[in-house]
Amino acid sequence: MNISGSIKQKLLQFLKKQKSPELLATYLFYLEQSLHLSPVVFVRDKIIFKSAEDAIQLLEADKKIWRETEIQISSGKPEVNEQTKRIYICPFTGKVFADNVYANPQDAIYDWLSSCPQNRERQSGVAVKRFLVSDDPEVIRAYIVPPKEPIIKTVYASAVTGKLFHSLPTLLEDFKTSYLRPMTLEEVQNQNKFQLESSFLTLLQDALEEEKIAEFVESLADDTAFHKYISQWVDTEE
């Protein structure tokens, strides 16, 4: 087993932070560094993956993260239509209120005029409620705007919450930060609440063979900086 100088430096930093560094914890830290493991748990399904990227790849394959869907974006109902018989018009903005769109169009235009930003006419300090009225079919017809066709847009829905996202990368980032909880390899080894994803389990079972742990210690023995820690591990085993 050949341990690189950079990983040895990280191991020494790790060991110096421990009050009583154990061999297994040190070896697990080494595995994190050498195999580039950053375990995460998907709590909902109680599964631990070797990394967030691995979790997303495998869960996507099982369709457990997102689904593509379509939404219809409408422009809202027209202010005036073919059934309109009378309209009330704001003289300051041109906003129109139709008798068949509002339950009480006169009250509606009064409310509008009282707060209309373009209405600067005042009487006794109160906004003037001046408006225009027309029953003329030709005038009414001039205010009819054909409704726009609704827009169909493809979006992405979270399979966990149903929340919609404009883009898939945004959804995946939200999933990663909200639903994948980071763990250390030592925490993975010491827990019994969650199961390990099959390929991650196989990897750990292979890496935790006694012969490989012994090879790890032998590789560190070539560097005097690790001798005091190795002595502690040997004394503990005896």
Curated annotation (Swiss-Prot):
InterPro entries: DUF2709. Pfam families: DUF2709. Belongs to the chlamydial CPn_0658/CT_538/TC_0825 family. This is Uncharacterized protein CT_538. It comes from Chlamydia trachomatis serovar D (strain ATCC VR-885 / DSM 19411 / UW-3/Cx).
